[in-house]
């Protein structure tokens, strides 16, 4: 028994959502990769659900020839592997054509890290604009951006976790946030005094807006989700960076998450604690920050030791 590729993809995504609790971003990524592979194979008369190992290898070779990074190729293969395992487990296939395929080797780049000084400049600029904004529309945006930044640097949340915070988390114990992360796993993260103050100022103005009682999100917006889109936050952050005299290209929500982790380790935090705060399932993901510190230490010695080579 075989299935149309489009129906097979929809069934797979439904299973990933209902049974495994996959995040919306993960589902969208799977959809893009699977539909791209299905379209490419359909042009050659092959149904993705019936594809053989050679067909899958061909799609990966095409990606490589088109200049896609090894990480993109590995992501595509991962999506296909999950897809065919689903078809096998449901009895629609007798084999897994991805079983003998290997993802191209990828070197993990060291994360970009902002210095404490530059993070300070960014936060100071956000606080200044929040205090000086007079026009109501500009004031709510400035207070929101300041609250987002202080919370992000205080907690190291993923940007999707940050913009998707329910308003209830800011109305309970202000010293901590209860965050629902990847795989629907909850964790508690402490809030700094500055973050609590910035959130409270924003929340006071937010609650005075018409319709605010009906929106469950801490950072509401006129969007499909009902909360601020992560792309909007990233764009506002880059604008703030430019106004603070920083290179906009070097600043993003993810860079601030990296800064949170790196600065904690620089000041003596242990790796396990940082792992828990970041919500990493595997400590090997967190260990990349120790490599960043090692690189900086090596550079420091090389530049300043009188007998260094």
Swiss-Prot record:
The active site is at 158, 182, 254, 257, 280, 289 (o-(3'-phospho-dna)-tyrosine intermediate). Residues 109-302 form the Tyr recombinase domain. Residues 3-88 form the Core-binding (CB) domain. InterPro entries: CB (IPR044068), DNA_brk_join_enz (IPR011010), Integrase-like_cat_sf (IPR013762), Integrase_catalytic (IPR002104), Integrase_recombinase_N (IPR010998), Integrase_SAM-like_N (IPR004107), Recomb_XerD (IPR011932), Tyrosine_recombinase_XerC/XerD (IPR023009). Keywords: Cell cycle, Cell division, Chromosome partition, Cytoplasm, DNA integration, DNA recombination, DNA-binding. It is found in: Cytoplasm. One of its GO terms (cellular component) is cytoplasm. It holds the Pfam family Phage_integrase. One of its GO terms (biological process) is chromosome segregation. GO terms for molecular function: DNA binding; tyrosine-based site-specific recombinase activity. It comes from the Bacteria. Belongs to the 'phage' integrase family. XerD subfamily. Forms a cyclic heterotetrameric complex composed of two molecules of XerC and two molecules of XerD. Site-specific tyrosine recombinase, which acts by catalyzing the cutting and rejoining of the recombining DNA molecules. The XerC-XerD complex is essential to convert dimers of the bacterial chromosome into monomers to permit their segregation at cell division. It also contributes to the segregational stability of plasmids. NCBIfam families: PRK00283.1, recomb_XerD. This is Tyrosine recombinase XerD. The lineage of its organism: Bacteria, Pseudomonadati, Pseudomonadota, Alphaproteobacteria, Hyphomicrobiales.
